């Protein structure tokens, strides 16, 4: 998934502090709006609890206060990826081959921006998703948002 320049810079800045606390930085989203939001997703083998999120928030806030890469007011949110886990990297897609995913594309493919199907394969920066029995190939750089579809 293509990250903005700001998201790339933020990822570089906060990866080390997150990993130093023993967590994986799953990904980040910076959502611009009336009240902008920096959303950070973390995970660990043992799962994530509220105290973990608070610890990461405290550490990341300290880094962001010093570096000050965001020029607008924003809210910082730290959370686990949840059941509808967002996918950010080729490694994430490869880890969840065989799982159902929803995709929102930056540019339409076959006049569609929204797709839902099962991740079949990952090849470099391309993913194959089986949609209604047919394989569709998408460039990771064209994926604006991707989430696993939880099944109960």
Curated annotation (Swiss-Prot):
Protein origin, superkingdom: Bacteria
Official protein name in the record: Ribosome maturation factor RimP
Q: What InterPro entries does the entry give?
A: Ribosome_maturation_RimP, RimP_C, RimP_C_sf, RimP_N, RimP_N_sf
Name one matching Pfam family. Answer: RimP_N
The opening ranks of the lineage are:
Bacteria, Pseudomonadati, Pseudomonadota, Gammaproteobacteria, Enterobacterales
Function of the molecule = Required for maturation of 30S ribosomal subunits.
Report keywords, A-Z.
Answer: Cytoplasm, Ribosome biogenesis
Q: Which HAMAP family match?
A: RimP
GO CC terms of this entry? cytosol
Quote the subcellular location field of this record: Cytoplasm
Q: What is its main location?
A: cytoplasm
Family membership: Belongs to the RimP family.
Q: Which GO terms describe its biological process?
A: ribosomal small subunit assembly; translation
């Amino acid at each position: 998934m293509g990250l903005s320049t700001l998201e790339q810079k933020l990822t570089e800045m906060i990866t080390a502090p997150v990993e130093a606390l023993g967590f994986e930085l799953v990904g980040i989203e910076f959502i611009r709006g009336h009240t902008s939001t920096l959303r950070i997703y973390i995970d660990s083998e043992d799962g994530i609890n509220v105290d973990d999120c608070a610890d990461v928030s405290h550490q990341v806030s300290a880094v962001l206060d010093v570096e000050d890469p965001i020029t607008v007011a924003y809210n910082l949110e730290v959370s686990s990826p949840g059941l509808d886990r967002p996918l950010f990297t080729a490694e994430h897609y490869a880890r969840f081959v065989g799982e159902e995913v929803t995709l929102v594309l930056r540019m339409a493919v076959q006049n569609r921006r929204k797709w839902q199907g099962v991740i079949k394969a990952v090849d470099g920066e391309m993913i194959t998703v089986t949609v209604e029995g047919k394989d569709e190939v998408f460039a990771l750089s064209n994926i604006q948002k991707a989430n696993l579809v939880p099944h109960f």
